[in-house]
Protein backbone atom coordinates (compact mmCIF):
# COMPACT_ATOMS: atom_id res chain seq x y z
CA UNK A 1 0.00 0.00 0.00
CA UNK A 2 1.37 3.38 -1.01
CA UNK A 3 1.86 6.26 1.40
CA UNK A 4 -1.13 8.16 0.00
CA UNK A 5 -3.40 5.12 0.19
CA UNK A 6 -2.47 4.57 3.81
CA UNK A 7 -3.10 8.24 4.65
CA UNK A 8 -6.52 8.05 2.97
CA UNK A 9 -7.44 4.86 4.81
CA UNK A 10 -6.36 6.33 8.14
CA UNK A 11 -8.29 9.58 7.71
CA UNK A 12 -11.49 8.17 6.26
CA UNK A 13 -11.86 4.98 8.29
CA UNK A 14 -9.10 3.38 10.37
CA UNK A 15 -8.22 6.48 12.40
CA UNK A 16 -11.27 8.65 11.72
CA UNK A 17 -11.14 11.78 13.91
CA UNK A 18 -14.76 11.45 14.99
CA UNK A 19 -15.36 7.71 15.21
CA UNK A 20 -11.97 6.46 16.41
CA UNK A 21 -10.05 9.35 17.96
CA UNK A 22 -13.27 10.91 19.34
CA UNK A 23 -11.87 14.40 18.86
CA UNK A 24 -13.89 17.55 18.31
CA UNK A 25 -16.94 16.10 20.06
CA UNK A 26 -18.19 19.46 21.35
CA UNK A 27 -19.05 20.98 17.94
CA UNK A 28 -19.76 17.54 16.50
CA UNK A 29 -22.58 16.95 18.97
CA UNK A 30 -23.84 20.53 19.27
CA UNK A 31 -24.06 21.68 15.64
CA UNK A 32 -25.21 18.54 13.82
CA UNK A 33 -28.96 19.09 14.20
CA UNK A 34 -29.21 19.54 10.40
CA UNK A 35 -27.18 18.60 7.35
CA UNK A 36 -26.64 22.27 6.52
CA UNK A 37 -25.01 23.11 9.83
CA UNK A 38 -22.98 19.90 9.77
CA UNK A 39 -21.74 20.50 6.24
CA UNK A 40 -20.91 24.14 6.96
CA UNK A 41 -18.85 23.31 10.04
CA UNK A 42 -17.27 20.34 8.26
CA UNK A 43 -16.11 22.41 5.28
CA UNK A 44 -14.75 25.11 7.59
CA UNK A 45 -12.81 22.51 9.58
CA UNK A 46 -11.58 20.90 6.36
CA UNK A 47 -10.17 24.19 5.06
CA UNK A 48 -8.43 24.92 8.35
CA UNK A 49 -7.00 21.39 8.50
CA UNK A 50 -5.50 21.61 5.02
CA UNK A 51 -4.16 25.12 5.57
CA UNK A 52 -2.65 24.39 8.98
CA UNK A 53 -0.99 21.18 7.79
CA UNK A 54 0.52 22.98 4.80
CA UNK A 55 1.84 25.92 6.82
CA UNK A 56 3.15 23.76 9.66
CA UNK A 57 4.96 21.53 7.18
CA UNK A 58 6.53 24.60 5.57
CA UNK A 59 7.84 26.10 8.82
CA UNK A 60 8.65 22.89 10.69
CA UNK A 61 12.40 23.22 10.11
CA UNK A 62 12.49 26.84 11.30
CA UNK A 63 10.46 26.63 14.52
CA UNK A 64 12.30 25.59 17.71
CA UNK A 65 10.76 22.56 19.38
CA UNK A 66 10.31 24.45 22.65
CA UNK A 67 7.79 26.91 21.14
CA UNK A 68 6.26 24.79 18.39
CA UNK A 69 2.84 24.40 20.05
CA UNK A 70 2.21 28.17 20.52
CA UNK A 71 3.33 28.77 16.93
CA UNK A 72 0.99 26.05 15.66
CA UNK A 73 -1.92 27.52 17.63
CA UNK A 74 -1.24 30.99 16.18
CA UNK A 75 -1.24 29.54 12.66
CA UNK A 76 -4.52 27.73 13.30
CA UNK A 77 -6.09 30.84 14.88
CA UNK A 78 -5.14 32.97 11.87
CA UNK A 79 -6.68 30.44 9.47
CA UNK A 80 -9.86 30.13 11.53
CA UNK A 81 -10.20 33.93 11.52
CA UNK A 82 -9.92 33.97 7.72
CA UNK A 83 -12.53 31.22 7.34
CA UNK A 84 -14.80 32.95 9.84
CA UNK A 85 -14.62 36.22 7.92
CA UNK A 86 -15.38 34.43 4.64
CA UNK A 87 -18.46 32.72 6.06
CA UNK A 88 -19.55 35.99 7.66
CA UNK A 89 -19.28 37.73 4.29
CA UNK A 90 -20.82 35.11 1.98
CA UNK A 91 -23.07 32.98 4.24
CA UNK A 92 -24.13 35.29 7.05
CA UNK A 93 -27.14 33.23 8.13
CA UNK A 94 -24.97 30.14 8.41
CA UNK A 95 -22.48 32.21 10.39
CA UNK A 96 -25.23 33.08 12.85
CA UNK A 97 -26.39 29.47 13.00
CA UNK A 98 -22.94 28.08 13.80
CA UNK A 99 -22.39 30.75 16.42
CA UNK A 100 -19.55 30.28 18.88
CA UNK A 101 -18.61 26.89 17.46
CA UNK A 102 -17.03 28.49 14.40
CA UNK A 103 -14.25 30.34 16.29
CA UNK A 104 -13.94 27.33 18.61
CA UNK A 105 -12.39 25.43 15.68
CA UNK A 106 -9.14 26.89 17.03
CA UNK A 107 -9.38 24.56 20.02
CA UNK A 108 -10.36 21.51 17.98
CA UNK A 109 -7.93 18.77 18.99
CA UNK A 110 -8.14 17.24 15.50
CA UNK A 111 -6.31 20.21 13.98
CA UNK A 112 -3.58 20.71 16.57
CA UNK A 113 -3.17 16.94 16.80
CA UNK A 114 -2.50 16.52 13.07
CA UNK A 115 -0.20 19.53 13.06
CA UNK A 116 1.91 18.07 15.86
CA UNK A 117 1.72 14.35 15.03
CA UNK A 118 1.92 14.47 11.23
CA UNK A 119 2.51 17.83 9.53
CA UNK A 120 5.53 18.72 11.67
CA UNK A 121 7.23 15.47 10.65
CA UNK A 122 6.28 14.94 7.01
CA UNK A 123 6.61 16.55 3.60
CA UNK A 124 4.35 19.28 2.24
CA UNK A 125 2.44 17.01 -0.16
CA UNK A 126 1.84 14.29 2.42
CA UNK A 127 0.77 16.86 5.02
CA UNK A 128 -1.70 18.53 2.67
CA UNK A 129 -3.19 15.16 1.71
CA UNK A 130 -3.42 14.15 5.36
CA UNK A 131 -5.32 17.34 6.13
CA UNK A 132 -7.67 16.65 3.23
CA UNK A 133 -8.40 13.07 4.27
CA UNK A 134 -8.79 13.84 7.97
CA UNK A 135 -11.06 16.75 7.09
CA UNK A 136 -13.18 14.62 4.78
CA UNK A 137 -13.44 11.89 7.41
CA UNK A 138 -14.53 14.38 10.05
CA UNK A 139 -16.99 16.06 7.67
CA UNK A 140 -18.48 12.69 6.70
CA UNK A 141 -19.24 11.90 10.34
CA UNK A 142 -20.79 15.35 10.79
CA UNK A 143 -23.00 14.96 7.71
CA UNK A 144 -24.16 11.42 8.53
CA UNK A 145 -25.00 12.39 12.10
CA UNK A 146 -26.69 15.60 10.94
CA UNK A 147 -28.73 13.74 8.32
CA UNK A 148 -29.96 11.13 10.78
CA UNK A 149 -30.90 13.73 13.41
CA UNK A 150 -32.65 16.00 10.90
CA UNK A 151 -34.54 13.07 9.39
CA UNK A 152 -35.74 11.72 12.74
CA UNK A 153 -36.38 15.12 14.28
CA UNK A 154 -38.00 17.07 11.44
CA UNK A 155 -38.67 14.52 8.70
CA UNK A 156 -36.59 16.50 6.19
CA UNK A 157 -33.19 16.43 4.53
CA UNK A 158 -31.17 19.49 3.46
CA UNK A 159 -33.51 21.80 5.34
CA UNK A 160 -32.08 25.31 5.39
CA UNK A 161 -29.69 24.61 2.53
CA UNK A 162 -30.18 28.22 1.45
CA UNK A 163 -28.18 29.26 4.53
CA UNK A 164 -25.12 27.64 2.99
CA UNK A 165 -25.64 27.91 -0.76
CA UNK A 166 -27.93 30.89 -1.23
CA UNK A 167 -31.64 31.44 -1.87
CA UNK A 168 -31.74 29.12 -4.89
CA UNK A 169 -30.83 26.13 -2.66
CA UNK A 170 -34.19 26.24 -0.87
CA UNK A 171 -35.47 23.88 -3.58
CA UNK A 172 -33.04 21.22 -2.34
CA UNK A 173 -35.06 20.58 0.81
CA UNK A 174 -36.51 17.06 0.78
CA UNK A 175 -39.63 16.36 2.87
CA UNK A 176 -39.36 12.64 3.61
CA UNK A 177 -42.39 12.54 5.87
CA UNK A 178 -44.69 15.03 7.55
CA UNK A 179 -43.92 15.84 11.19
CA UNK A 180 -46.45 17.82 13.24
CA UNK A 181 -44.22 18.06 16.30
CA UNK A 182 -40.42 17.78 16.04
CA UNK A 183 -38.84 14.80 17.81
CA UNK A 184 -36.91 16.77 20.40
CA UNK A 185 -34.71 13.88 21.55
CA UNK A 186 -33.16 13.71 18.09
CA UNK A 187 -32.74 17.47 17.85
CA UNK A 188 -31.16 18.04 21.27
CA UNK A 189 -27.64 17.06 22.45
CA UNK A 190 -28.81 13.80 24.14
CA UNK A 191 -29.94 12.56 20.74
CA UNK A 192 -26.56 13.50 19.32
CA UNK A 193 -24.83 11.36 21.97
CA UNK A 194 -27.09 8.41 21.16
CA UNK A 195 -26.56 8.82 17.42
CA UNK A 196 -22.80 9.10 17.85
CA UNK A 197 -22.74 5.95 19.95
CA UNK A 198 -24.71 4.07 17.30
CA UNK A 199 -22.31 5.21 14.56
CA UNK A 200 -19.30 4.04 16.60
CA UNK A 201 -21.02 0.71 17.27
CA UNK A 202 -21.77 0.30 13.56
CA UNK A 203 -18.13 0.93 12.66
CA UNK A 204 -16.96 -1.60 15.24
CA UNK A 205 -19.36 -4.22 13.87
CA UNK A 206 -18.15 -3.63 10.31
CA UNK A 207 -14.51 -3.83 11.40
CA UNK A 208 -15.09 -7.06 13.32
CA UNK A 209 -16.83 -8.71 10.37
CA UNK A 210 -14.13 -7.60 7.95
CA UNK A 211 -11.46 -8.97 10.27
CA UNK A 212 -13.37 -12.24 10.59
CA UNK A 213 -13.40 -12.62 6.79
CA UNK A 214 -9.64 -12.22 6.57
CA UNK A 215 -7.72 -15.48 6.10
CA UNK A 216 -6.20 -16.63 9.35
CA UNK A 217 -2.48 -17.20 9.37
CA UNK A 218 -1.62 -20.25 11.41
CA UNK A 219 1.51 -19.91 13.43
CA UNK A 220 3.87 -22.84 13.11
CA UNK A 221 5.60 -23.70 16.34
CA UNK A 222 9.23 -24.65 15.98
CA UNK A 223 10.73 -27.01 18.51
CA UNK A 224 14.32 -26.33 19.22
CA UNK A 225 16.44 -29.45 19.13
CA UNK A 226 18.91 -29.86 21.91
CA UNK A 227 22.31 -31.08 20.76
CA UNK A 228 24.43 -32.83 23.32
CA UNK A 229 28.07 -33.28 22.59
CA UNK A 230 29.23 -36.87 22.97
CA UNK A 231 32.87 -37.43 23.81
Curated annotation (Swiss-Prot):
Assigned GO CC terms: plasma membrane
Primary location recorded for the protein, binned into one broad class: membrane
Protein topology in the membrane: Multi-pass membrane protein
Coiled coil start-end: none
Compartments where located: Cell inner membrane
Keywords: Cell inner membrane, Cell membrane, Electron transport, Membrane, Translocase, Transmembrane, Transmembrane helix, Transport
Quaternary structure and interacting proteins, as annotated: The complex is composed of six subunits: RnfA, RnfB, RnfC, RnfD, RnfE and RnfG.
Record-given protein name: Ion-translocating oxidoreductase complex subunit E
The organism of origin for this protein: Shewanella frigidimarina (strain NCIMB 400)
Native organism taxonomy: Bacteria, Pseudomonadati, Pseudomonadota, Gammaproteobacteria, Alteromonadales
Amino acid sequence: MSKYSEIAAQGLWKNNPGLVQLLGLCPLLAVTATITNALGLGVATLLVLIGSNVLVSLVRDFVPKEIRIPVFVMIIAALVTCVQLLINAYAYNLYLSLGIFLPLIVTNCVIIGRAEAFASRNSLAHSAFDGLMMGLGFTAVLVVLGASRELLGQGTLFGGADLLLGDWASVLTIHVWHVDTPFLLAMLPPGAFIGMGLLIALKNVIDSRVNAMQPKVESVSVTRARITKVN
